[in-house]
């Protein structure tokens, strides 16, 4: 594995596949970590029976991010105006043509929290660790291979 991650959905689906493969076949799944094994890539790897790593590999980055860019100020400076015609007030909230409202930001934060909880649960199950231990490691940062091993990742 040599990846900084990917999408939450792909990570979840591939983690399920890796876990299911081992259960269906009775064969162990072995992951060899290269330079980086992070985020969704680590979520997938966490389902393996064995994870091999170099001492200096970047492992972990357990966390979730959703980016909504507000380009409205830049568009205004460039003389670009956008009229969004929508079926609901929040339909254009992720288009970047206006700032998020407080309610929209709270909505997206709730989604991130739900997705992150799934990530944490998946890692806890795959590494046979208590959920609270994984949650404590879910800082979004990577660990060196040495520290990841010490932490049970």
Describe every region a protein language model picked out:
Residues 1-27, 33-126:
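Small-residue-centered hinge/linker elements
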């Amino acid at each position: 594995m040599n990846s900084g991650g990917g999408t939450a959905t792909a990570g979840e689906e591939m983690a399920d596949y890796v876990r299911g493969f081992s259960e269906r076949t009775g064969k162990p799944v072995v992951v060899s970590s290269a330079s980086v094994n992070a985020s969704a890539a680590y979520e997938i790897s966490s389902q393996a029976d064995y994870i091999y790593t170099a001492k200096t590999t970047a492992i972990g980055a357990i966390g979730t991010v959703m980016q909504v860019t507000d380009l409205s100020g830049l568009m205004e400076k460039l003389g670009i105006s956008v009229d969004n015609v929508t079926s609901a007030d929040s339909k254009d909230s992720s288009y970047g043509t206006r700032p998020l409202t407080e309610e929209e930001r709270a909505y997206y934060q709730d989604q991130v929290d739900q997705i992150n909880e799934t990530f944490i649960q998946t890692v806890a199950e795959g590494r046979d660790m208590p959920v609270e231990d994984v949650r404590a490691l879910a800082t979004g940062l990577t660990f060196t291979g040495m520290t990841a091993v010490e932490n049970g990742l």
